[in-house]
Regions:
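C-terminal regulatory/interaction module of P-loop NTP-utilizing enzymes
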Residues: 228-231
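Short gly/ser/thr-rich secondary-structure transition/capping motifs
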Residues: 2-9, 164-167
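Residues immediately C-terminal to the Walker A/P-loop in P-loop NTPase nucleotide-binding domains
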Residues: 41-42
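Hydrophobic positions on the alpha1 helix immediately C-terminal to the Walker A/P-loop
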Residues: 34, 38
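Conserved inter-motif catalytic segment of the P-loop NTP-binding fold
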Residues: 5-6, 10-12, 16, 46-134, ...
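Phosphate-binding/switch region of NTP-binding enzymes
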Residues: 22-23, 28, 33, 45-47, ...
């Protein structure tokens, strides 16, 4: 192990090379915006496969278009966006088919970094412990087979904003949490609805940089068609 290189930091200490990582948050807090922002940054160095199960290609195009100034954000060539149409996949061996499609797309596009938005489409039974555990085992096998780095977007049930984010806020089984190498979450400030914060919940590589005493503070802005989280400081959760 000592002879192998240390895993590279893919994005601000939140996700490291070779990890299966999870980003979770409540609805409408900007999970996909943050994930695309990560993909945009990483794709300037290497290919990134972004599996989008949330937006159509037109919705995605409009999200990154400044209508007033007629400016479209230009993503790096290394960012490859793909869509999964769940209606085109048989419910027999649904999860196996999804994983095979992801594997094939990653190989064809020469992408070792994969972002999957979101967990609901990947695993029909993600809230059922046994099925979720089996699915994550298959995903871990895929990671080990190709040395992929995989980020999975997930939901959290409605939560009290005054309470700190914990692993218990991740929707689904505890088994899901145990399989992830690292986990971080997006929360909304209960003092200012316009602000978001990012907190690390689980770390295996690196260190806890952004715990409850030092969360990343952001506001969501659009600059020349690029909708993104703009870092404005640090704070206690």
């Amino acid at each position: 192990a000592a002879r192998r290189p240390n895993p590279r930091d893919l994005y601000h200490g939140l996700w490291y090379e070779g990890e299966v990582c999870c980003l979770f948050a409540d609805s409408n807090l900007g999970k996909s915006i943050y994930a695309v922002q990560m993909a945009d940054a990483i794709a300037r160095q290497q290919n990134v496969l972004y599996m989008d199960c949330e937006l159509s290609d037109k919705q995605f195009q409009l999200r990154y278009y400044d209508v007033e100034n007629n400016i479209r954000h230009i993503f790096p060539d290394g960012l490859i966006r793909a869509e999964i149409d769940p209606e085109a996949i048989s419910m027999d061996n649904y999860e196996d088919t999804i994983i095979k499609n992801i594997e094939d797309a990653a190989i064809v596009t020469n992408s070792n970094v994969i972002i999957i938005d979101n967990l609901t489409y990947l695993c029909n039974a993600s809230d059922k412990g046994e099925a979720a555990g089996i699915f994550m085992m298959k995903l871990m096998q895929l990671k080990k087979k190709h040395n992929f780095s995989i980020l999975i977007i997930a939901h959290t049930p409605k939560r009290n904003l005054a309470n700190p984010i914990t692993q218990n806020d991740l929707a689904g089984s505890k088994k899901l949490y145990n399989f992830f190498d690292s986990v971080f979450a997006i929360g909304k400030s209960y003092k200012d609805n316009c602000l978001r914060y990012v907190k690390q919940v689980k770390v295996r590589a690196g260190e806890y940089r952004y715990d409850s005493d030092n969360v990343l503070i952001y506001e969501i802005v659009s600059d020349r068609g690029f909708l993104h989280f703009e870092h404005i400081g640090y704070a206690q959760e």
